[in-house]
Amino acid sequence: MANITAAMVKDLRESTGAGMMDCKAALTETGGDMQAAQDWLRKKGLSKAAKKAGRVAAEGLIGALTSGKKGVVVEVNSETDFVARNEHFQGLVKMIAQVALDVGADVEKIKAAKVGSITVEAAIADSIATIGENQSLRRAAALEVSEGVVASYVHGAVIEGAGKLGVIVALESPGKTDELAALGRQLAMHVAAANPQAIDAAGLDPEVVKREKDVLSDKYRQQGKPENVIEKIVESGLKTYYKEVTLLEQAFIHDSGKSVAQALKEAEGKVGGPIKVAGFVRYALGEGIEKEETDFAAEVAAASGKK
């Protein structure tokens, strides 16, 4: 039997909003599997939403930079937020974004690229020596279109183009560049706020869609609903799900009375041509990284020789 810890119960509560005893039961029933426990709670109707429990704790900055038809977003991590506010580190992030715009999104190629007489990797090493704290280029992404624009938005910017969250959006269109750029920035802001998982339903991971269908089916099957009724409920539930997680079906944050798809269609007249979302990338600082928590009481006890 898996050892169910208080920390596991706490994490499940934070990600689902379910009660403590329900969370403990879910973890016990699923052998401590956090994802399976979230599904178990949803099937029992005990969780309103199964948001992924992503404890984001890494520090640093997200840098986003565009130039006409191409754009990049990079994540450079540091150990503390203090370093993220350091002008030298901020300059490093902007320099790395510029290099990525020139050479592409391959992290190893970025690190090997030269800026002046030294490589980016050497510049990072120099920054570590100067500031006295570890820093690293974690990831990078790039978008490019043959016709249209790539726009960006940085939320919580500490300097232009660098902050805690960065988005780039690629729009393909033969229309007016200035109008497209303004629309692209609005769309990038939408992506930052709404966090879509794909452009449309076709872009979603089939396994994720299957899991959603299974959760909905099992939930209503446990309630004793007939199979023909369950099929209709699941179909309706998936439509709602798509409106929540796909960009084109989400309510546009700048005009909630329209979907993003409708807003783009209406903008085509102003832009002067058809508009297609070719892609988007959203980087939130530290997502997927867990920062080691310090137990100060334990450290003090260890230092004093206490057990």
Swiss-Prot record:
Chief place where the protein resides: cytoplasm
PROSITE patterns noted in UniProt: EF_TS_2
Family assignment from sequence similarity: Belongs to the EF-Ts family.
Location of this chain's protein in the cell: Cytoplasm
CDD domains: UBA_EF-Ts
Region (Involved in Mg(2+) ion dislocation from EF-Tu): 80-83
Domain of life: Bacteria
Keywords on record: Cytoplasm, Elongation factor, Protein biosynthesis
Transmembrane segments: none
A molecular function GO annotation: translation elongation factor activity
Pfam families: EF_TS
Protein name: Elongation factor Ts
Provenance organism: Bradyrhizobium sp. (strain ORS 278)
One Gene Ontology CC term in the entry: cytoplasm
Function, in words: Associates with the EF-Tu.GDP complex and induces the exchange of GDP to GTP. It remains bound to the aminoacyl-tRNA.EF-Tu.GTP complex up to the GTP hydrolysis stage on the ribosome.
